[in-house]
Amino acid sequence: MGCVFCKKLEPASKEDVGLEGDFRSQTAEERYFPDPTQGRTSSVFPQPTSPAFLNTGNMRSISGTGVTIFVALYDYEARTGDDLTFTKGEKFHILNNTEYDWWEARSLSSGHRGYVPSNYVAPVDSIQAEEWYFGKISRKDAERQLLSSGNPQGAFLIRESETTKGAYSLSIRDWDQNRGDHIKHYKIRKLDTGGYYITTRAQFDSIQDLVRHYMEVNDGLCYLLTAPCTTTKPQTLGLAKDAWEIDRNSIALERRLGTGCFGDVWLGTWNCSTKVAVKTLKPGTMSPKAFLEEAQIMKLLRHDKLVQLYAVVSEEPIYIVTEFMCYGSLLDFLKDREGQNLMLPHLVDMAAQVAEGMAYMERMNYIHRDLRAANILVGEYLICKIADFGLARLIEDNEYNPQQGTKFPIKWTAPEAALFGRFTVKSDVWSFGILLTELITKGRVPYPGMNNREVLEQVEHGYHMPCPPGCPASLYEVMEQAWRLDPEERPTFEYLQSFLEDYFTSTEPQYQPGDQT
């Protein structure tokens, strides 16, 4: 990620000369078109055709390799009678891996047969089975993970190169008096003969040999490799095999986490085994049939910056079962003591994570429609994930109406969406600009002192919120770009992600020279 995108995707200049006049002179039909996803069904949404579609950041599953003996990367406790309980290091014979999420396996130690989550296992003796191998994660996520608590100087990981297919990168946590803790990255290059090297004077037959060498001597690296980066067990891809439409009685609602206009959010347990979050919708909020169709699409959206949809109860009252995020909504988090103490680098990083998730949705041509801090969830290590994507389109409540309803999020909604129902990725970009103000102000309601009608009238005439106190001018400029009246002049989420990820990047090269001393 980084500077390459910034240069390629630089949005138009700041001045919108004549834009307001053009906006006002056109008719609604000339300016806007109907919501392109109205009436869409799951049959026209991109289907998962390969593991690449379902990549969730640090997923380690392997398919199509011909390897049938796999090793467990983590402990796992069976959730159903069809699952296998296993411990880290246990070996399996994979019997059937035709379904991507859950594979049928037989334990070589116990002889028991059942299903295992595919992202909890890897081929024996492969690079994917190594604790230091993190697979297809971004450079920025590598930095986030290595800078988290518990990692000493010299903590490291190896990941797939973002720029060179088939190559790898080594990321190391370092420290010095001037910069404190920071991360350095090294390219691992591949020889034509099949070996690997960082510097030509030290070549190795395998990545494992390379790691063993640099754990014994730094040999030109910034620091000796001391320990693999700490990690937590990933979310399984779904609750269990075929656990999609589930029985309401399999969910125990334990503690109410929040209440909204259309229902409540609970901490719950599925099948007496798995902690989950459960959104319960009031009867009449949306059509169960329409919800189930949309949910079939939503479950195909998989990215580590999107809250994973686990399962549904499709009869009223509808239950939406998702992964549990320990700190709740970003809005509530910003308002409490820990959120109030966050500094600008933390806030910008949280914004970058949201932009990353939205960039994925942009690539998938999926529209959120209700992007705001209340619909971003926060987990350990300040990980942010996007929630409630796509649900706003299904709400049937008369009060959820931009013209007169009190429940519609006018202050976050682009004018073309609020006035004419023109929801697009670009209207999500507008909402992201408003979300940036929520971050900078630690949860302040947008457009303070203005009601919804005033906001709609003023925004249509080109009004922008002034720069929030303490907000850098360069960040406010991005907000203003997101609020351009012409949707096509707003930046892409790909650009926003790159801009925010590189916001504090110094002038040092992205990768360290392999021969540095």
Curated annotation (Swiss-Prot):
Regulation of catalytic or functional activity: Activated by autophosphorylation. Prior phosphorylation at Tyr-511 by SRC inhibits ulterior autophosphorylation at Tyr-400. Activated by phorbol myristate acetate, phosphatidic acid and poly-Lys. Binding (via SH2 domain) of HCLS1 that is already phosphorylated by SYK strongly increases kinase activity.
GO biological process: bone mineralization; defense response to Gram-positive bacterium; innate immune response; integrin-mediated signaling pathway; negative regulation of natural killer cell activation; peptidyl-tyrosine phosphorylation; positive regulation of cell migration; positive regulation of cytokine production
Chain intervals for the UniProt region annotation (Interaction with CLNK): 102-103
Keywords recorded for this protein, A-Z: ATP-binding, Cell membrane, Cell projection, Cytoplasm, Cytoskeleton, Immunity, Innate immunity, Kinase, Lipoprotein, Membrane, Mitochondrion, Mitochondrion inner membrane, Myristate, Nucleotide-binding, Palmitate, Phosphoprotein, Proto-oncogene, SH2 domain, SH3 domain, Transferase, Tyrosine-protein kinase, Ubl conjugation
EC top class, as a word: transferase
Residues with Phosphotyrosine modification: Y32, Y196, Y400, Y511
GO cellular component terms attached to this protein's record: aggresome; cytoskeleton; cytosol; mitochondrial inner membrane; mitochondrial intermembrane space; plasma membrane; ruffle membrane
Residues binding ATP, per UniProt: L257, G258, T259, G260, C261, F262, G263, D264, V265, K279
Posttranslational mods: Ubiquitinated. Becomes ubiquitinated in response to ITGB2 signaling; this does not lead to degradation. Phosphorylated. Autophosphorylated on tyrosine residues. Becomes phosphorylated in response to FCGR2 engagement, cell adhesion and signaling by ITGB2. Prior phosphorylation at Tyr-511 by SRC inhibits ulterior autophosphorylation at Tyr-400.
SH3 domain ranges (all copies): 65-126
PANTHER family referenced in this protein's UniProt entry, alphabetically: TYROSINE-PROTEIN KINASE
Entries under InterPro entries matching the protein: Fgr_SH2 (IPR035693), Kinase-like_dom_sf (IPR011009), Non-receptor_tyrosine_kinases (IPR050198), Prot_kinase_dom (IPR000719), Protein_kinase_ATP_BS (IPR017441), Ser-Thr/Tyr_kinase_cat_dom (IPR001245), SH2 (IPR000980), SH2_dom_sf (IPR036860)
Lipid sites, type S-palmitoyl cysteine: C3, C6
E.C. designation(s): 2.7.10.2
TM regions (residue ranges): none
Family: Belongs to the protein kinase superfamily. Tyr protein kinase family. SRC subfamily.
Record-listed Phosphoserine modification sites: S13, S50, S206
Record's function text: Non-receptor tyrosine-protein kinase that transmits signals from cell surface receptors devoid of kinase activity and contributes to the regulation of immune responses, including neutrophil, monocyte, macrophage and mast cell functions, cytoskeleton remodeling in response to extracellular stimuli, phagocytosis, cell adhesion and migration. Promotes mast cell degranulation, release of inflammatory cytokines and IgE-mediated anaphylaxis. Acts downstream of receptors that bind the Fc region of immunoglobulins, such as MS4A2/FCER1B, FCER1G and FCGR2.
The name this protein goes by in its record: Tyrosine-protein kinase Fgr
Catalysed reaction equations from the record: L-tyrosyl-[protein] + ATP = O-phospho-L-tyrosyl-[protein] + ADP + H(+)
Domain spans labelled SH2: 132-229
Residues of the Protein kinase domain: 251-504
